[in-house]
Amino acid sequence: MFYDFVPQSRFLLGTAGYPSPQILQQAVMASESEIITVSLRREGSQGGAFRELLTQLNKRILPNTAGCHTVKEAVTTAHMARELFNTRWIKLEVIGHADTLQPDPFALVEAARILCADGFQVFPYTTEDLILGEKLLEAGCELLMPWGAPIGSGQGLRNIEGLRSMRLWFKDIPLIIDAGIGAPSQAAQAMEMGFDGILLNTAVARAQDPLRMAQAFAAAVRAGYDAHGAGLIERRDMATASTPIFGMAQFS
């Protein structure tokens, strides 16, 4: 599924911005996530203590290159993360615009090419653009992480038709919605469309009750995944009766 790992949970959770380390721990456990993301560039002066906390959680760590704006920054950060966390995994972010936090497609593909050649297993944060997706796969990526909406915006799936096209086009490629999810209903919607996972951070970390919100997202992701697997009925323009008319009384 995700390179050499097949998770039981399709919910990936970020570890930034929680009110306290204790609440972070509680939220991660409540989420049932097996994969957690961590930003090397945003750990700050307490990085050692934070990494110890992550170790105690006993989850698979997916380091990311959040905050990187150039190929050089992203590649350097990825190599540092591999040394610190002893993992080939890297969530590759190369930001092109400080306000929208939209990926720089050209730098993203170049960084992905370099890192894949260096033996990394790259999780690229991208858009729903099909050509960009193709270029990332050609660079060596084996999965894609399209955004639902700008990072931290909570807008949900802003371009549903584009994401649906992406799911149909890359039918055999794992696709994880990354960024923009603000409510459990939005996560369920993405999973119902056939996406393979949801990665989010802000919606849980900034919730009034992060633990309860983590539980809600876990349930929503699971429900959406099960619904897609069960087979949703086709949407219709007109009503169709669900109750048969056979055996009804006849009045004269």
From Swiss-Prot:
Enzyme Commission code: 2.8.1.10
EC main group: transferase
GO biological process, one term: thiamine diphosphate biosynthetic process
Keywords, comma-separated and alphabetical: Cytoplasm, Plasmid, Schiff base, Thiamine biosynthesis, Transferase
Catalytic activity line of the entry: [ThiS sulfur-carrier protein]-C-terminal-Gly-aminoethanethioate + 2-iminoacetate + 1-deoxy-D-xylulose 5-phosphate = [ThiS sulfur-carrier protein]-C-terminal Gly-Gly + 2-[(2R,5Z)-2-carboxy-4-methylthiazol-5(2H)-ylidene]ethyl phosphate + 2 H2O + H(+)
GO molecular function: thiazole synthase activity
Subcellular location, principal: cytoplasm
Pfam families the record matches: ThiG
GO cellular component, one term: cytoplasm
Keyword Transferase appears in the UniProt entry: yes
Protein location: Cytoplasm
InterPro entries found in the cross-reference section: Aldolase_TIM, Thiazole_synthase_ThiG, ThiG
Positions annotated to bind 1-deoxy-D-xylulose 5-phosphate: G152, A179, G180, N201, T202
UniProt pathway annotation: Cofactor biosynthesis; thiamine diphosphate biosynthesis
Active-site residue numbers: K91 (schiff-base intermediate with dxp)
General function of this protein: Catalyzes the rearrangement of 1-deoxy-D-xylulose 5-phosphate (DXP) to produce the thiazole phosphate moiety of thiamine. Sulfur is provided by the thiocarboxylate moiety of the carrier protein ThiS. In vitro, sulfur can be provided by H(2)S.
Record family assignment: Belongs to the ThiG family.
Assembly and interaction partners: Homotetramer. Forms heterodimers with either ThiH or ThiS.
Protein name: Thiazole synthase
Organism: Erwinia pyrifoliae (strain DSM 12162 / Ep1/96)
